[in-house]
Amino acid sequence: MADLGAESVVSVEYRGRVAVITIDNDKKLNALGQLQYYALARAMQEVAKHDEVFVTVILAKGRYFSAGADVSISRAAPVDATDSHKLWLSTFVAFNLNITHTFATHPKVLVVGLNGPVIGLSAALVSFADFIYAVPHAFLLTPFSSIGLVAEGGASRALVQRLGPAKANEALIMSKRLWAKELLDAGYLNEIFDYPKGEDAAFRERVLKEVDERLGDHLNGESLVGIKKLIRRPELETIHNANVHEVFAGLDRFVKGIPQEEFRKLASGEKRHKL
């Protein structure tokens, strides 16, 4: 199992034709800072280079799949507008472009197992998966409008495409929480595996069993990734455009100081998202 550095809560394990990426930061509900999202991107980029791998599975340990961005990390910006623009351009824009591009262009069949809620940027990125499985108590929440941001992580295209415009508008514009059953009915999830809270280890094993049974040696690996490439090809240019537009719209918000003030309120407990 590869460890991707001290800043990382991400690990990679190779199981023949399957690579398993695991997020393990339960004490923070698997919230991720910029360096940890970078580590996740690097893990996926590493897997992409392995010719023997045809399926990438992303799993998480603990109560949440991911609570999104780690709001406990300071997001204070310089007072000077030029310095502020430079800071967010070199951090927010660069890191978001990288992680979104990595998910959008990942060449392996991508499987995600939601052991619990998925929030924010993480929820947007999950939408790029080819197969998504979840527990009944999982929910998706993209509270961008609540924290003064706009859509990110390719959500304005990938999440809308997978969830459908009606539910996607509820998720993105209203910052509405969508439970697993709603996600399944909308076609966002492939299947719900009935495991209660506290059974995340058993759920992870169930997802891996599904992968072995449905995407195993009885299917030609080159065909799997070849079919995915053909399915995704018409959308890629649109996704790349959405990614660029999202990060620069987000940059404008950060330069104005709007989201970091909302993050401060959340971190201090002054504000709670209306779940």
Regions found by a protein language model. Name each.
Residues F95-I147:
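Glycine-rich beta-to-alpha active-site loop
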Residues M1-L4, E261-L275:
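Terminal low-complexity tails and localization/encapsulation signals of metabolic enzymes
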Residues S156-A166:
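Hydrophobic, secondary-structure "cap" segments at the distal end of domains
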